[in-house]
């Protein structure tokens, strides 16, 4: 969340500079009276109409829409990438260097990477796939949604992840904790 705030302010999203964190803290302080809840699993809260806006993942929005439709609720959830950009993440698979049976891990990864399986995972989870071949079998409501499968201009506004040193992470966490606990 702090990366999004810093990016909105035109600052380096992974910064831990005192002046950047102070600016982010001031902005967060200004919006704090309007924040009612912090929660990392918004699907149920959205479907139960306990939230009017949520900062979350594209797949959460698709899952909320599916859940609402299954419950017979006529709700319309939409996912948007802020014009200033937002953080990007992706799932990855890795094999530990000391894995006892790396050949099985390779077989599993190869299985998952098959286009039909990638499409099935994408259709089930509501998250996009990076596989162009799999994309052909993705539900058209997802595949044709420009807020899920981003164009190049939108993709260019995404903030890539990178490691943040522990001391910097602690400084950033202090800002976030003060915001969540409504401390000045």
Segments and roles (model prediction):
Residues 1-50, 64:
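Extracytoplasmic ligand-binding site segments that recognize negatively charged/polar headgroups
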Residues 3, 21-29, 73-97:
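Periplasmic-binding protein-like
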Residues 6-11, 89-101, 120:
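A bilobed periplasmic-binding-protein/Venus flytrap-type ligand-binding module shared by bacterial periplasmic
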Residues 42-43, 51, 105, 118:
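Short, hydrophobic alpha-helical packing/hinge segments within bilobed ligand-binding/sensory domains
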Residues 44, 152-184:
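Conserved C-terminal helix/tail region of periplasmic/extracytoplasmic solute-binding proteins
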Residues 49-52, 74-76, 104-105:
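Loop/turn elements at helix/coil->beta-strand transitions in domains of secreted/extracellular proteins
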Residues 53-73:
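A ligand-binding cleft/hinge motif common to bilobed small-molecule-binding domains
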Residues 96-156:
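Mature extracytoplasmic/periplasmic domains
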């Amino acid at each position: 969340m702090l990366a999004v705030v810093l990016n909105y302010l035109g600052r380096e999203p992974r910064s831990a500079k005192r002046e950047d964190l102070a600016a982010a803290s001031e902005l967060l302080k200004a919006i704090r009276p309007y924040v009612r809840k912090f929660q990392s699993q918004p699907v149920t809260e959205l479907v139960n109409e306990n939230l009017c806006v949520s900062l979350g993942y594209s797949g959460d929005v698709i899952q909320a829409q599916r859940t609402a439709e299954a419950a017979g609720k006529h709700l319309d959830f939409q996912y948007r990438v802020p014009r200033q950009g937002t953080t990007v993440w992706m799932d990855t698979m890795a094999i530990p260097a000391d894995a006892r049976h790396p050949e099985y891990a390779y077989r599993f990864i190869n299985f998952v990477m098959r286009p039909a399986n990638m499409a099935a995972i994408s259709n089930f989870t509501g998250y996009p796939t990076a596989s162009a071949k799999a994309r052909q079998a993705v539900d058209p409501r997802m595949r044709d949604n420009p807020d899920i499968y981003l164009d190049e201009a939108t993709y260019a506004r995404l903030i890539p992840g990178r490691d943040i040193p522990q001391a910097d992470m602690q400084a950033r966490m202090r800002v976030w904790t003060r915001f969540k606990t409504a401390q000045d």
